[in-house]
Structure formats: C-alpha cells, structure tokens
Swiss-Prot record:
Part of the 30S ribosomal subunit. Contacts protein S5. The interaction surface between S4 and S5 is involved in control of translational fidelity. NCBIfam families: PRK05327.1, rpsD_bact. Keywords: Ribonucleoprotein, Ribosomal protein, RNA-binding, rRNA-binding. It comes from the Bacteria. Belongs to the universal ribosomal protein uS4 family. One of the primary rRNA binding proteins, it binds directly to 16S rRNA where it nucleates assembly of the body of the 30S subunit. Pfam families: Ribosomal_S4, S4. GO terms for biological process: ribosomal small subunit biogenesis; translation. Residues 96-158 form the S4 RNA-binding domain. This is Small ribosomal subunit protein uS4.
Amino acid sequence: MARYLGPKCRLSRREKTDLQLKSGIRAIDSKCNIERIPGMHWQRRGRTTDYGVQLRMKQMIKRYYDVLEKQFANYYKQADRLKGSTGDNLLKLLESRLDNVVYRMGFAATRAEARQLISHKAILVNGEVVNIPSYQVKPGDIIEVRSRAKGQLRIKGALELAQQRAPISWIEVDTKKMTGTFKEQPDVAELPAEFKVNLVVELYSK
C-alpha cells in the first residue's frame, strides 16, 4: 500500500481527532472540521461493529505515526515477541522511530518533514549520519541536526512551534545547539488518551 499523499485534514476528519499531520501554525479547528467525516455529508451512519471499532483504532494509530500497513503489521509482530504488554510495546516501538523522535524534539514541524530531513542526511545519531526514518532510537542516543542544516528556516520555525506542545519526559533538547537526548523508553501514559491500543491487540489476535 502506497503512502497517502492526499489532504492531511481528510485523515484527521476520518479519525475525528487531530493526528498532528499539519504543522500547527494554525489551530486544527480553524481549517479542518474534524467532526465531519469525509464523504458522509452528515447522513446518519449505521451501527459500527466491534471489528469496525478495532479497525478504526488501528487506522488512527497507524496514521498518527504515518506508517504503512505492512510496516504497522511488522511492528505488531515484533511487539508481540517482546516481554510485557503487546500494546505498550507496539506504542514504544512506534515512538522510538527516528522520524518520530526528530519530530518530538522539535526539529521538524511534522513527521513527514522529519522523514524528509532524515532522508536528506540532515540528522545525526551519536555523531553518525542516519538516513533511515524507521531507525529505532535507543535510550542514551543523541540526536543532532547536522551543522550544514542548522541554518534552515524550517527547522528554526519548527523549534518555535514545538514550544507550544506539551513537553515529553523521555527526551531532553538543547534548542540552541539543536541536539537532543533520548533519555529512556517512552511512557505510554503520556501518549494521546484516544489511543485504546487494546483494540488493536484484539484485532490482530483474531
């Protein structure tokens, strides 16, 4: 399945929540009517089945992290092999993707922009160039914007926008040096309350 290249607002409307796919320069509700599901024209929908609810939750989380269907399925398989809660493991794996960490640290306004920076070799991990967006960041890893990219206006703008977001406990950022440390495994309790990951586990357990 190819990556979705259509209107980002449409995806947020489909899931009835802000998937943080836009830069955040303007409030999401100023440009996107989240309550209106695309293509429905306000007509009443039929009763949603348990499977439908589970599928929607999977789609919401998959779109939030902007990963493809096959990637998401592989993350679930990996999470299921690890010790502990499969659902929590899944979210930790997704949160530890390099593109997500770059976004969380404020070096990019969106995860899509973070992927672009990584692909263009503008990001260092422990002093080495890493151009794989799905690279799994480990506790203690230091993420840095490459010297030649530090003057980019979009990165400076992203850092300003990041100040408006709630701080994340598992990362530490030096905005002046454009470096950050991935201190520890993500705390799933700090992730969006809408994420009912147990529904995803139920879906894949069938």
